[in-house]
Amino acid sequence: MDVVFALGGSVLMPKEGASTENIQNYAKAFKKLKEMGHRVSVVVGGGNTARQYISVAREFTNESFCDEIGILATRMNSMLLISALGKDAVKQVPENFKDAELILNMDKILVMGGTHPAHTTDAVSATLAEFIDADLLVIATNVDGVYTKDPRCNEDAVKLDKINTKELLEITGSSSMSAGSSGVVDPLASKIIDRAELKTIVVKGIPEEILASVSGDHNGTTITP
């Protein structure tokens, strides 16, 4: 199976900072999937690293330049995961999809970050999945699925086990995005998922759920065309 993962930067690099064990556990999960015969691509978010830099930069500059800072943060996080993957990855963070596909064709795990200003890594992962005709897109984030509202600030939020892409558009359509902002699935990614008719799974961004998302035994939300 050809699988693209959107790995939230905040799960790889939590607020307390880098953890060798944490990064190694993610690397082990992706290596295991490769050993099982899957073709694995990982798009890593900027997370807290990006938000810290952007919060300072925003005092001096515009959103477009803040986007560029965020992109660099995603690539730094990507390099950490690449280093943990060792020989299963290439020590290069591609900046476009053609270079990304070359790495996949070398039978390596692809790891990349952001590509364009105003595009979140969710949107990048969805576009990559469309570009390479992936079988599955997995969004591994700090929430365990798609809810009717943000569960982090709404006690009455209801988790949705299965929805279609049109319903996803309705849920995410009112969201606004700026450099460094985070959400379970951002509006642009939702539009790409719908356009490409991508089967998508949203799970809690832990190694166990990453593995389970491919086997189908996960606890997240399945999004179908």
UniProtKB/Swiss-Prot annotation:
Catalytic activity: UMP + ATP = UDP + ADP
Protein known as: Uridylate kinase
Subcellular location: Cytoplasm
Activity regulation info: Inhibited by UTP.
NCBIfam families: pyrH_arch
Subunit structure: Homohexamer.
Native source species: Methanococcus maripaludis (strain C5 / ATCC BAA-1333)
EC supergroup of this enzyme: transferase
InterPro entries in UniProt: AceGlu_kinase-like_sf, Asp/Glu/Uridylate_kinase, Uridylate_kinase, Uridylate_kinase_arch/spir
SUPFAM superfamilies: Carbamate kinase-like (SSF53633)
The protein's Enzyme Commission number: 2.7.4.22
Taxonomic placement: Archaea, Methanobacteriati, Methanobacteriota, Methanomada group, Methanococci
Superkingdom in the source lineage: Archaea
Binding-site positions, UMP: 46, 67, 115-121
Function text: Catalyzes the reversible phosphorylation of UMP to UDP.
Pfam families noted in UniProt: AA_kinase
PANTHER family recorded: URIDYLATE KINASE (PTHR42833), URIDYLATE KINASE PUMPKIN, CHLOROPLASTIC (PTHR42833:SF4)
Cellular component terms per the entry's GO annotation: cytoplasm
GO biological process terms on file: 'de novo' CTP biosynthetic process; UDP biosynthetic process
Family the entry assigns: Belongs to the UMP kinase family.
Stored Gene3D superfamilies: Acetylglutamate kinase-like (3.40.1160.10)
Biochemical pathway: Pyrimidine metabolism; CTP biosynthesis via de novo pathway; UDP from UMP (UMPK route): step 1/1
Residues where ATP binds: 9-10, 47, 51, 141-142, 147, 150
GO MF annotation: an example: ATP binding
UniProtKB keywords: ATP-binding, Cytoplasm, Kinase, Nucleotide-binding, Pyrimidine biosynthesis, Transferase
